[in-house]
Amino acid sequence: MAAKIISGINIAKQIKQNIAQKIAQYIVNGYRRPGLAVILVGADPASQVYVNSKRKSCAEIGIESKYYDLPATITEVELLSIIQRLNSDEMIDGILVQLPLPEHINPIHITEAISSDKDVDGFHPYNVGRLCQKIPTLRSCTSYGVMKLLESTHIDLSGLHAVIVGASNIVGRPMAMELLLAGCTVTITHSRTKNLVDHLSSADIVIVGIGHPNFVKGEWLKQGAIVIDVGINRDTYSKKLVGDVDFLTAEAKASFITPVPGGVGPMTVAMLMQNTLQAYEHHLQAV
């Protein structure tokens, strides 16, 4: 029996509708709109697509977005100066710097410069540390979105074995903390992991984010596993967007699976909107 498809598009749509309703109520009550600063450095086509998607979502749900389209030649000092001004701007609740950055700019310096209460990407060490201590505030958008996808299956995650393929700071590491918080037994695998298939064959939940098209095969999976594909790649031959999981073979083995596109991607944007609302509400309470 083929797996049930977890539609990130549908779930993200509902989340954004809920956010829009809350924002509309704040406006009726006389409050300002939430403000999100979006910074793009350089002209990377993929980054431009991602930024446009985020700004479109802001417009749809009532968040005021302030866009900074900066040249790739901007210095790190100049970028840090812009961030410091935004940190002090009371009309800005969230600051997003689209990655990747040019090689001469250290992304760690940029992430750490953003005020932790405006870090709507959830990358600041303070927010990562809060998640590790089981008291999350602003959470990493992709892993937060994956948890919402898992919740939609209505399966009790406590005690399940989750295997993460990929140990990046953006996906793998925060994903592990989220799953631990949900009571899972977590295994993180990466490029140096031996016997990857042995790990995957015992996994109740498989989450893959490594940037290799169609890497994980269905025959590697446990029957009935929940498969979440975070990858998004352009297939060399078909030119279509594909994930890190070989969808056709995995669909035959899994109980639930996310498609690419239309799975994790929309959820990442939706949780960015959720984080912006959360930061906005925090700032309103602090006034």
Swiss-Prot record:
Its EC number is 1.5.1.5, 3.5.4.9. GO terms for cellular component: cytosol. CDD domains: NAD_bind_m-THF_DH_Cyclohyd (cd01080). Pathway: One-carbon metabolism; tetrahydrofolate interconversion. The keyword Hydrolase applies. Catalyzes the oxidation of 5,10-methylenetetrahydrofolate to 5,10-methenyltetrahydrofolate and then the hydrolysis of 5,10-methenyltetrahydrofolate to 10-formyltetrahydrofolate. This is Bifunctional protein FolD. The gene is folD.
